[in-house]
């Protein structure tokens, strides 16, 4: 039969590869970065949640911004440029995990991987809307799966909508899993005046003054 499959409302997840060496940044994280426990899952995060303001991360920040422009303007075709807001390091020792969560007050989120290998658990994306009925599946794909395990390599950045639920299973390796996460937002406005959806941040700040 003649047929056409249409993928409605696809969720864009982009992976980009950092080509430069990042040993200096990783060495800084391992030796100088202060960590605090992040919840009850035996994982840690950096005390500093604005790490990309530090000069040592300037090359990585430029790579993140370039990747964001590809994601936002070439894939999503949006006009308002995204800027990085908070940024922090995740430190997952052996036997730790990362609970399911989203990133509120952010549009697109990113995770850069400093130290991962094939023995470590991949990031897991979970379906936002549940399937109404459980049916027996003989082969899983993007239409019938409730979660998606995405293997990542060191030096890769992954970008995804901040509303997308994600988690990390227990680290069963004997090494620390180290990554850097960041959130984004616009600096000027959201929406469109013509469509009556405009939120002009600069104008709001002027009124406050």
Which residues does each predicted region cover?
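Non-heme Fe(II)/2-oxoglutarate
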Residues: 1-80, 88, 196-204
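Preference for bulky hydrophobic residues occupying beta-strand positions
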Residues: 16, 89, 112, 182-184
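Short, solvent-exposed loop/turn segments at secondary-structure junctions
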Residues: 21, 117, 130, 164-166, ...
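A generic structural signal for short beta-strands and their flanking turns/coil linkers
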Residues: 83-87, 106-108, 176
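Catalytic core of non-heme Fe(II) oxygenases with the double-stranded beta-helix
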Residues: 89-159, 190-196
């Amino acid at each position: 039969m003649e047929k056409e499959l249409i993928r409605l409302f696809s969720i864009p997840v982009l992976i980009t590869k950092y080509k430069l060496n990042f040993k200096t940044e990783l060495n800084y994280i391992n030796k100088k970065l202060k960590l605090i426990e992040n919840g009850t899952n035996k994982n840690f995060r950096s005390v500093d949640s604005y790490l990309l303001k530090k000069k040592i991360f300037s090359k990585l920040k430029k790579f993140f911004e370039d990747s964001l422009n590809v994601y936002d303007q070439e894939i999503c075709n949006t006009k308002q440029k995204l800027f990085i807001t908070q940024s922090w390091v995740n430190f997952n020792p052996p036997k730790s995990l990362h609970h399911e969560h989203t990133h509120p007050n952010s549009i697109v989120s990113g995770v850069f991987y400093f130290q991962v290998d094939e023995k470590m658990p991949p990031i897991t994306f979970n379906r936002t809307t549940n399937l109404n009925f459980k049916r027996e599946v003989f082969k899983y794909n993007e239409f019938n799966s409730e979660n998606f395990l995405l293997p990542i390599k060191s030096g890769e950045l992954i970008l995804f909508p901040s509303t997308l639920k994600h988690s990390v299973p227990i680290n069963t390796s004997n090494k620390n899993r180290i990554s850097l996460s960041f959130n984004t937002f616009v600096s000027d406005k959201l929406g469109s005046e013509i469509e009556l959806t405009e939120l002009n941040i600069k104008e709001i700040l002027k009124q406050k003054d």
